[in-house]
Amino acid sequence: ISACLVGSEMCIRDRDYSEVTTQYLLKKMKEDKRVVTITSGTPAVLGFTPDRRQEAGKQFVDVGIAEEHAVALASGIAANGGKPVYGVYSTFIQRSYDQLSQDLCINNNPAVLLVFWGTLSGMNDVTHLCFFDIPLISNIPNMVYLAPTCKEEYLAMLEWSIRQNEHPVAIRVPATDVISCGEPVESDYSNLNRYKVAHRGSKVAILALGSFFGLGQSVLSLLKDKANIDATLINPRYITGVDSELMDELKADHELVITLEDGVLDGGFGEKIARYYGATDIKVLNYGAKKEFVDRYDIQELLRANHLTDEQIVEDILSLIG
């Protein structure tokens, strides 16, 4: 995310998802007085500078460094017909696990959580690691955790999550530069766990989650160049479930499925796919980070250590299927 520090405030430049979110929420709050924006000591996560907080008025609440209270507040507002949107950095969401489970998800209150910097390439000191949110959030019952790949998909998911009244919804905001899809995206995500096939091929299927969709595109291209394999590329969109219909379809003309996720492997998205195929002949390779605490790491070294470069992934694929 492109940001700079000015005094005690962060200034947000135009081309990042904080700015995209600010513009959307300011407009949405004017249109619908039920919408309330919440932060917990980090208003810059949503791009809410002092002038924007003043513009939002009573529809903006910063609770201070109290993520637990932020989630409980969002749950209570949602339970009473409001439309709360809570923005938080991935590294801080673990502080509110009790409230996510006991207050929000048990009651199935339709609050919205926007999780920023959920990525291996975010903050890199050991107390601010940003890649444990997928197993933490996605395994709580009733929660719907979404992983958009571009600006249009993100805004469509955000609009739907505020409009719907059935589930608590978290969105893993892309940890990339703002990317435009250049094509229409769905506006209704209520038919849960339906993945999107971005390119249909055969033999190898690449499930590239959220911010790692670009890595999936690179692997797709490199497989074609190196081995003339026209693979299938899938945008899962939903972190919290498996598209069993699509996964069953792949069995007909695929022998290998790989998953790519910008986070820790243990308890993550890829393991759901591996478990689904466990009793079949389909081979599965999961790519993500090892479960460990790392400190002041170099991102390129971390990616290489976890076989997360396109060259390494293609090498692994070809070693399995020739």
Predicted regions and their residues:
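Hydrophobic/aromatic ligand-binding patch that stacks against planar heteroaromatic rings
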Residues: 73-77, 103, 136-137, 160, ...
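Active-site glycine- and acidic-residue-rich loops that bind
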Residues: 91-93, 148-155, 265-267
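A short, small-residue-rich loop immediately preceding and capping a beta-strand
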Residues: 36-38, 59, 80-91, 111-114, ...
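Single conserved hydrophobic/aromatic residue that forms the stacking wall/gate
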Residues: 1-7, 12
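Thiamine diphosphate
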Residues: 18-24, 30-55, 62, 68-71, ...
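Short, basic, glycine/proline-bearing loop/turn elements
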Residues: 9, 55-61, 82-89, 120, ...
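Conserved thiamine diphosphate
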Residues: 80-82, 107-111, 116-164, 316
